[in-house]
């Protein structure tokens, strides 16, 4: 819900999209810094998009989840454990949430990403990468002094992963309180997509308080356990076999057991 002042500023922007913050300040009789705060609030609440004062009329999706810097190493020949292996190292943008947001943007959808960025060069590159592909990150969190989420993995010469380290502690900062601060922009979305890199209490807060349809990627069989208490609040789940087995309690070995697992999941209140 907009405050009276925010509604007033919103109406002026609607009447004159090219209005400047200085003009708004003069018309409202407040400082320019105060106008900046109101504009930020309007953006966070989904009333306007970014700094260009584009009014939010087109339906949008919000994705809440991981945005990582992926670092991959692949040897030129057979991997030798405990030794330095000549090969290639590549860096790319990843994270389940970011990847979903990227694909939505490729489909020409209006998409916003709520994630946690650190305060390092990887965060700068990730943010630029999101903006370059059309992902709005105004709702995201920047954690002072923190390291941006990073996923490091080593493959063998065939491209099969052998070892990996994930540094994802930063998502502990995506707390229920942070979500509550951004609840307006989440509620106005056509749908909310989450992944289970979020803390369990945050997932449960979203499930209990967000009224738009919630879509979820369980990420892994271990992280999928965070969903057990809120499956009935989720609209659509995208599990693989291991995740479906863990959540349904049914071992999937053939078509019949697959259908039984699906029915068990749907019985929780899950729509799809």
Predicted regions mapped to residue ranges:
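Short beta->alpha connector loops
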Residues: 119-120, 196-200, 218-222
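Glycosyltransferases and closely related glycan-assembly transferases
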Residues: 202-214
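Conserved phosphate/ATP/ADP-binding segment of small-molecule kinases
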Residues: 211-214, 218-272
